[in-house]
Amino acid sequence: MAMRAIQQIMLGTVSRTEAEAAETLKRIKNAGYDGIELNGFMIRPTPLIVRYLTKMAGMPVGRGGKFNWKRLVSEAGLSVTGIHTDLGGLEREPENIISEAKKYDTDKLIITGMYRFDYSNKDKVKTLAKRLNDAGKRMKEEGITLCYHNHNAEFLKVDGKRSVMDILIEETEASNLGFEADTYWAAEAGVDTIGFLEKLRGRIKLYHINDRGTKLSKPTFTPLLKSDSMELGYGNMPLERLTEIVLSENVDAVILESHKNWPEKSPLLSMEMSAEFMKKYVR
């Protein structure tokens, strides 16, 4: 059975102190979730630039880098499904990242895309594929599965036909690199989400789930509305079918990541609303 989990990025505004983080994790457990996916930049001291960029994106990470997350997660009765990290850090200090993964009893490390990177440059994308393949081979020696997590940049066409994602799939070995599929970002890029998962069959290790749609609180002046993150089952994505596909792939975890647009600006209320879908379809 796949774990029902939460992405730590949702918790920045409700983990301002260690005591608050403990209460937040207990509430997550009580809502029916089994695990949490951690971010390296949230369990280590967080650089100012990271706090600034995530805040500007509507996802403040807080100052929890000094908290004892190992104890907090364990006391809440949750398991760690994996740790998000960056490729450069993994290449420079593999021993430290490996040690961190083992400390949290997880065998999954996830590369969350590239920053200050030209996704339109085919040669650079091909080099990225090689770097991921090499890093994954190194992690495999330690009993760790390396995964790549997509956003929307990976659906950019780099040669008129193939997308960045196509190259990452085709030019890496399945034994060295798995994928943490995120269909919200595929939908945002205009991609057929079901077709995307079908293309990844055999390599999906983790699944990020989110819904996409529109919330209205008052009449609008025009019929042009902005889509955004939604609680599971409240938007327009074919989540039942998408979940069916990833469960047939025996993913280790289905991980909720609602970025923002939360009811009453509360990520906890949002995750509790999404828990109803998770309990019904992720089992």
Residue ranges and their predicted role:
Residues 79, 84-178, 268:
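Active-site acidic/histidine proton-transfer and metal-coordination neighborhood
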Residues 62-69, 92-97, 162-166, 192-193, ...:
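Alpha-helical scaffolding within the catalytic cores
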Residues 14, 18-21, 55, 59-62, ...:
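Flexible, glycine- and charge-enriched loops at secondary-structure boundaries
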Residues 37-68:
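Glycine-rich, proline-tolerant flexible connector loops at the mouths of alpha/beta enzymes
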Residues 42-45, 114-119, 214-216:
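Conserved radical SAM core fold
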Residues 11-13, 43, 85-88, 115-117, ...:
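Solvent-exposed loop/turn segments at secondary-structure junctions
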Residues 1-34, 40-42, 51, 165-181, ...:
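Histidine-acidic metal/acid-base catalytic patches
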